[in-house]
Amino acid sequence: MFDSTLNPLWQRYILAVQEEVKPALGCTEPISLALAAAVAAAELEGPVERVEAWVSPNLMKNGLGVTVPGTGMVGLPIAAALGALGGNANAGLEVLKDATAQAIADAKALLAAGKVSVKIQEPCNEILFSRAKVWNGEKWACVTIVGGHTNIVHIETHNGVVFTHQACVAEGEQESPLTVLSRTTLAEILKFVNEVPFAAIRFILDSAKLNCALSQEGLSGKWGLHIGATLEKQCERGLLAKDLSSSIVIRTSAASDARMGGATLPAMSNSGSGNQGITAIMPVVVVAEHFGADDERLARALMLSHLSAIYIHNQLPRLSALCAATTAAMGAAAGMAWLVDGRYETISMAISSMIGDVSGMICDGASNSCAMKVSTSASAAWKAVLMALDDTAVTGNEGIVAHDVEQSIANLCALASHSMQQTDRQIIEIMASKAR
């Protein structure tokens, strides 16, 4: 709980972080479908005998190539099956945390029997949409998630509607924290980070503990593309310098290796994504350790990173053609710059350079290769900080970067929200043709 004596804006900042920074086991798009299946199974009379599911094109894109934790299998069908047979309907993004070996075996058997289908919802105007319908004979239950990975909007069974979400806001009801955040500025966020009582933000240290454990697991070298472990090995061979820059990349990418490779450890997510959480957290942790920062300084740097990442990503569609590891790394750049320098000018220059560097990176679906994009984004973030410390940055005379960092962010988000929609459709078409 936060201190009710804090000013209302600061309370909304803290609520925004608490809503957007949560533990998640497994890539959040397949997990969203697993949650829909788990909730549907909880409403079903009798055991699940068959699963049908429908998802948006973007969710299909992010579910085709990613490993579901504990199963050794990729894709949405195993996520839907395991959610239905072994999911915890009350666990949100950790829906599969209690899945047993028997549940995994049963889910694989259901798949092998041809009792699980996942299709693209047509037509579909939602970017993030998942619907699971589970059957027992003629009895059924159906759950629909829209807009957010855990945002259940409709529950229905063969007996009738159980729940439906009304989107209207009651008179006098407070605006959501994200709505409030959308009207703030980076300067206001920095003021909060500098002045908020440590006790009110101490909770954010848990995000570092969770993702550091994931990073350590990734360094074992058995997950995903094992980028972190490989780069660490090259340091030992003398092919890569063992310094702060390489440590940032190694420890950050290792966490993503484990995450995308199916390790049964949760990641602390940001904006509904484990990789965004990893990218916002791990570079800041590594730099904090390098400078011997105490818990309070680490917490403040993490809050700046998380809030900056959320603030930027909130101006984007929840899923898009833009790789959001890049925007999360902009948050990390802010957090690292604050640790080293603390000045708003340094932070804004670092973010502007990031926008001038990695803004064109596409999202071609969740997979092991996400760790490559995470490593690139983390490296670019530290490079941008180093430039800013030397009073150097991509300027408003170049590309989409403006003279004001807020306008630079708006330009990037406009590009991703509008012009990159055709890019997204082309990516999905290419991936669908590969799957046929």
Swiss-Prot record:
One Gene Ontology MF term: L-cysteine desulfhydrase activity
Annotated signal sequence range: none
InterPro entries for this protein: Ser_deHydtase-like_asu, UPF0597
GO biological process per UniProt: L-cysteine catabolic process to pyruvate
Family to which the UniProt record says this protein belongs: Belongs to the UPF0597 family.
Protein name listed in UniProt: UPF0597 protein YhaM
